[in-house]
Design a protein with these regions (language model features):
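N-terminal leader/linker segments that initiate helical-solenoid repeat arrays
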Residues: 18-90, 97, 327, 331-338
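Residue-level recognition of tetratricopeptide repeat
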Residues: 57, 93, 127, 188, ...
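Helix-start (N-cap) detector for alpha-helical repeat units in TPR-like alpha-solenoids
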Residues: 49, 82-85, 119-120, 153, ...
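Canonical tetratricopeptide repeat
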Residues: 54, 86-90, 124, 158, ...
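Terminal, low-structured helical/coil segments at or just beyond the last alpha-helical repeat
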Residues: 34, 40, 177, 278, ...
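Structural marker of alpha-solenoid helical repeat scaffolds
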Residues: 44, 78-80, 114, 148, ...
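Structural signature of tandem alpha-helical TPR/SEL1-like repeats
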Residues: 65-70, 98-107, 132-144, 149, ...
């Protein structure tokens, strides 16, 4: 009888150990990055997907990001889980905020494996690949995000690379949940290839969705800058700065607009909002060189060096470049005169 009791106890211990091991193996550590999971919580494991997600939400609200990540990933292990694509999107967003781009990429793609039309994951992958320099891949994800949104809106989900025009963009259905970053990001890609009309239609659609979206306002301003429509460029750039005065892209673009309007002193004042005086002086000089005005660039670059001669190596290089261009032009003029 004693032997039977011992056998039962040993069996229970073995079963408990197996259950513990099985539970540990359910946790997909390949999606986790943070403190050792053993140190995160002593609570009983969640019994349902919803409980795990709820725990993750609470942890995220309390800024305990490692615990939130752990709980969200644990929610994926339930066999009948129904929120996997949304949870994986959230996991990807956490990694994105931490600049863990490889894990973010992995989580977003895992989300699409669960639901190919997850708009958020498609949009984020579009941005990730575009920033990585893989613009064609980024573009394809953005277009997929727009199509997924048209499905949600019961519109026409047949948007392709070949049929996007300013006219067709006007027909796309949207609401306040539509993917602003996908519209704006796709618009920027059209701007890069010089198709400013389509670019502006896409970015404006993004602003229809969210009129206060700073990235979209900055992108639209820059699109008009590339078209040399400086009044419109300044209008949208200043609108972005009225919402976020410290936005560096908007400040830089406003400086570029001032330079394009032959206002280098104003550009210097604008650049000085978010950089040191030598950096601002170098910026003005550098962009004047790009505008084909090396002679005007020289005094700004010399001032940058005077302000910080030991540190400002970049200004020296730009000054040498400006002087070389000026000398080359003088030599060319002499040859022509002879």
């Amino acid at each position: 009888m004693l032997w039977i009791k011992k056998y039962v106890i040993i069996s229970l211990l073995v079963l408990t150990a197996c259950a513990t091991n099985e539970q540990a193996s359910d946790f997909d550590s390949s999606l986790y990055s943070g403190k050792p999971v053993e140190s995160l919580t002593n609570d009983e494991p969640p019994k349902t997907e919803e409980e795990a997600i709820s725990r993750g939400d609470i942890a995220l609200t309390n800024k305990n990001v490692d615990l939130a990540l752990y709980e969200y990933i644990r929610s994926l292990s339930f066999p009948n889980a129904v929120h996997k694509d949304k949870t994986l999107y959230t996991v990807g967003r956490i990694h994105l905020a931490r600049e863990n781009y490889e894990l973010a990429d992995k989580a977003f793609r895992a989300s699409l494996a669960e639901n190919p039309d997850n708009i958020g994951s498609l949009q984020e992958l579009g941005t990730l690949y575009t920033k990585r320099g893989e613009k064609d891949v980024g573009k394809s994800y953005y277009i997929r995000a727009l199509n997924a949104d048209q499905i949600r809106m019961k519109g026409n989900p047949n948007i392709t690379n070949d049929n996007i025009t300013a006219e067709t963009v006007a027909t796309y259905r949207y609401d306040d949940k539509s993917p602003v970053a996908a519209y704006s990001g796709l618009g920027v890609l059209y701007d890069v290839r010089g198709d400013h009309g389509v670019a502006q239609a896409l970015i404006r659609k993004g602003l229809d969705i969210d009129p206060r979206n700073v990235n979209a306002l900055v992108s639209l301003g820059y699109s008009y800058y590339m078209e040399k429509e400086y009044s419109k460029a300044a209008h949208f750039t200043q609108a972005a700065l009225s919402i976020k005065p410290s936005d560096e892209r908007a400040i830089n673009n406003l400086g570029l607009i001032a330079l394009a309007k032959d206002q280098p002193r104003q550009a210097l004042s604008i650049f000085s909002r978010h950089m040191t005086e030598p950096e601002a002086l170098n910026n003005v000089g550098y962009f004047l060189i790009l505008q084909g005005k090396p002679d005007e660039a020289i005094p700004y670059l010399q001032q940058a060096i005077d302000k910080n001669p030991a540190y400002y190596e970049l200004a020296n290089k730009n000054l040498e470049r400006a002087l070389a261009i000026v000398r080359e032009r003088q030599d060319t003029s002499s040859v022509v005169l002879q």
